[in-house]
């Protein structure tokens, strides 16, 4: 019984390999250059104080990448 299941699995994988499944066009893995252009780093973010390394007090609770709010 197990040999029949193994043979069936091999036949299915040969007829329909997993690499033949097309990736979705919206996935970022297909377009790494666009992913890098869309990245907004913290030093370009208007609510981030690059000198002190902290966020504007009104947005401190919204951002996880900044340290405690500057006072």
Swiss-Prot record:
Pfam families: Conotoxin. Residues 21-52 form a propeptide. Disulfide bonds join 54-70, 55-66, 60-69. One of its GO terms (molecular function) is ion channel inhibitor activity. Keywords: Disulfide bond, Neurotoxin, Secreted, Signal, Toxin. Its main location: secreted. Expressed by the venom duct. The cysteine framework is III (CC-C-C-CC). Classified in the M-2 branch, since 2 residues stand between the fourth and the fifth cysteine residues. This is Conotoxin TxMMSK-05. It comes from Conus textile (Cloth-of-gold cone). The lineage of its organism: Eukaryota, Metazoa, Spiralia, Lophotrochozoa, Mollusca.
């Amino acid at each position: 019984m197990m040999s029949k299941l193994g043979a069936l699995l091999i036949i299915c994988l040969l007829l329909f390999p997993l690499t033949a499944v097309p990736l979705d066009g919206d996935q970022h893995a297909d377009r790494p250059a666009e992913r890098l252009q869309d990245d907004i780093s913290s030093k370009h973010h208007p609510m981030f104080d690059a000198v002190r390394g902290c966020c504007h007090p009104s947005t401190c609770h919204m951002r996880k990448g900044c340290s405690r709010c500057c006072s």
